């Protein structure tokens, strides 16, 4: 028993727990559950990269960054029997989650608290946060998990860490956030809100709770973080610009962009009513239920599906829509009622907020802890309301907000167990 404790408390033991427990959980799920894609978007990416549609890999697919699609397409050429796009998602999630848990163990060791704290945090996170994305793969959520790992790594960095450790942290954050951006750009924007909070947290603790550091070192630390964020943003958008430039040379991509302009303008979220209950509106433009269902499957070959009919449907629906507040409340209510997972996760965030600020936080720093918690949970609430207002609130969008908020709060829980920063 003593030998086991010695192994667990060693540096190798922390790596073993972080990666081993995650691997065990993944193995059990993959062996006992059917893994599938949550939406058709990922299926289309996979078909293009694997060459199922054309006979050869097509990395210019609209939903994926060109520089991410090329290596996956090459792997399909070398070993076409393996599901490389699915493997990418699983490996990206596994590595990101393991790194986050490794940060938990590092913080526990630095604070000299019981190993039970990070173990419980890891098990809770795996069971209640990361199992759904594993069995129902979606590139929005994979991008979120990649980016969240950078949020946790940055938030767990200590000013007393070795220079080599800090270099590794910056390098990992850069790669993880770049991959997150390349996997799904839209989820990257919400991730960057939480990453910015992690960076501000690092800067604030440097000025407030590191009296041994000179003013010059504090300014240098701030400059490093700001320079890193600027370089990251420039790199991400630079890669995106080049990717779009290459992809737009393809006639197929140009044709898709033309079609997508119609889809976004007329048939995107909240821009048209369901067929049931609105038969008169659709019959007025010679649409039956089959025509309507064809548009849901992105099939636009019917001659009755044209700019005139789409405009008629959209304008009629927009004229009868409820107020912005009513629409926002309705979308959030539907999300709450449709998924018990949402109810439990919101309750867990509230409990963590209460425990952090009333039970864990030290009195002399309680105001700072409360402020950080409010920024995290308040940012989560604001982004949730924004998505509800825009009508873009499926489960995957909610997960893109929940995961970084939950993991950031868990990181703060481990950081605030001790007065030392």
Model-derived regions: residue spans:
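Membrane-interface alpha helices of multi-pass inner-membrane proteins
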Residues: 168-187, 196, 228-238
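Extracytoplasmic loop-helix module adjacent to an early transmembrane segment
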Residues: 18, 22-62, 72-77
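Hydrophobic, aromatic-rich transmembrane alpha-helices
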Residues: 99-100, 329-367
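Membrane-proximal stem/loop segments at transmembrane-domain junctions that anchor or position
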Residues: 244-330
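Short hydrophobic alpha-helices at membrane interfaces in multi-pass membrane enzymes
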Residues: 112-119, 153-178
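Short hydrophobic/aromatic helix or loop-helix immediately within or flanking a transmembrane segment
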Residues: 58-92
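Start-transfer (signal-anchor) and selected internal transmembrane alpha helices
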Residues: 1-28, 115, 203, 217-232
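Transmembrane-helix motifs of polytopic, lipid-linked glycan transferases
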Residues: 91-111, 353-360
């Amino acid at each position: 028993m003593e030998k086991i404790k010695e192994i667990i408390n060693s540096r190798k033991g922390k790596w073993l727990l972080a990666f081993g427990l995650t691997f065990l959980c993944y193995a059990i799920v993959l062996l006992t559950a059917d893994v599938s894609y949550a939406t058709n978007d990922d299926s289309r990416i996979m078909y293009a990269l694997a060459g199922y549609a054309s006979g050869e890999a097509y990395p210019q697919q609209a939903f994926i960054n060109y520089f991410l699609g090329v290596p996956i397409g090459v792997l399909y050429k070398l070993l076409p029997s393996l599901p490389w796009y699915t493997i990418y998602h699983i490996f990206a999630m596994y590595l990101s989650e393991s790194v986050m848990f490794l940060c938990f163990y590092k913080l526990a060791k630095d604070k000299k608290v019981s190993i039970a704290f990070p173990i419980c945090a890891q098990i809770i996170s795996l069971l209640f946060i990361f199992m759904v994305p594993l069995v129902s793969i979606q590139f929005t959520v994979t991008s979120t998990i990649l980016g969240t790992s950078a949020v946790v790594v940055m938030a767990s960095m200590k000013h007393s860490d070795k220079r080599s450790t800090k270099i590794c942290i910056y390098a990992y954050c850069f790669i993880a956030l770049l991959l997150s951006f390349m996997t799904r750009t839209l989820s990257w924007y919400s991730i960057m809100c939480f990453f910015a909070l992690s960076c501000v947290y690092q800067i604030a603790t440097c000025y407030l709770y590191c009296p041994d550091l000179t003013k010059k070192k504090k300014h240098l630390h701030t400059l490093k973080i700001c320079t890193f964020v600027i370089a990251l943003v420039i790199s991400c958008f630079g890669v995106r610009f080049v990717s779009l430039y290459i992809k737009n040379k393809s006639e197929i991509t140009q044709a898709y962009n033309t079609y997508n302009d119609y889809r976004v303008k007329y048939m995107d979220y909240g821009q048209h009513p369901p067929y049931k209950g609105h038969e008169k509106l659709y019959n007025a433009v010679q649409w039956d239920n089959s025509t309507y269902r064809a548009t849901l499957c992105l099939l636009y070959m019917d001659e009755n599906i044209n700019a005139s009919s789409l405009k008629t449907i959209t304008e009629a629906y927009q004229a009868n829509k409820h107020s912005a507040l009513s629409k926002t409340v309705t979308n959030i209510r539907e999300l709450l009622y449709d998924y018990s997972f949402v109810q439990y996760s919101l309750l867990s965030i509230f409990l963590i907020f209460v425990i952090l600020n009333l039970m864990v936080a030290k009195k002399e720093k309680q105001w700072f802890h409360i402020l950080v918690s409010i920024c995290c949970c308040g940012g989560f609430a604001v982004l949730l309301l924004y998505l509800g207002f825009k009508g873009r609130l499926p489960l995957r969008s909610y997960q893109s907000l929940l995961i970084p908020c939950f993991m950031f709060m868990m990181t703060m829980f481990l950081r605030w167990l001790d007065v030392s920063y």
